[in-house]
Amino acid sequence: MLLWEQIAANRRAYQVTVALVVAALALFGLLVTLALGLGVSGLGAGLALAVLVVGFAPGMGERAALRDAGAQAADPGRWPRYHNLVEGLAQAAGLPMPRLYVADSDAANAFSVGRDPERAALVVTRGLLTTLNRVELEGVLAHELNHIWSWGARLATLGVALGRVPGLLRLLAPARREFDADEGGARLTRYPPGLVSALRKLAGGVQPPDRPGLRHLWIIAPGDATHPPVDERIAALQEL
């Protein structure tokens, strides 16, 4: 799927999610006020609550994800390769560069969060930066940048805030999005084998601590329903 197609699909999914949340909260407010004998005034209160939840959820989700991952701003002096690769990819695509963070973990993994492509954050673990070679790291970073630029990161970030709602994560973070980001990242680097090699290393390495709010964000999350099997992702990349 091309980037513009991903953007359209992710925006539709976001709109559907917002509509569902608004409808659910409005209905809840209405039922409560009817039960209390207050008439239909609760419908307005429910709608107001829904607007607040939807408006603040992406920002809350981003802050929660960075906090739970223990992410700190990436020092360019300490991690120059990280900064240089992201800058190069952003310039090549002509798209915004996210804020860069590093999580102090031996596990090799990465994720992206944000409200939109101009206000996004890319998080990698220390283990990722020390485990992968330059070509492999570029493949992973391109994958995450695709999530950001396709507006997929906004959906996933909303999932951090609202992920406890049954079934909502399947809508916000479908398994298909990983295939799309793999393909988009490979198109950006023009070298699918780099990401293939990275996925193999990540799948066989140490995994980050299992925090339910972050599970759907990681590029590798074995056994999670929001991620397709790594072997299937590799097979798809090898067909490009």
Model-predicted regions and their roles:
Residues A92-R119, L171-P174, G185-L240:
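Active-site-proximal gating segments in proteases and membrane effectors
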Residues E62, V86, V124, G139-H147, ...:
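Active-site recognition of the HExxH zinc-binding catalytic motif
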Residues M1-F111, L162-L171, A175-F179, T189, ...:
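Hydrophobic or amphipathic, alpha-helical segments that drive membrane association/targeting
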Residues L145-A161, P192-P193:
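Catalytic Zn2+-binding segment of zinc metalloproteases
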Residues V123-G139, L172-A175:
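Short pre-active-site segment immediately N-terminal to the catalytic Zn-binding motif
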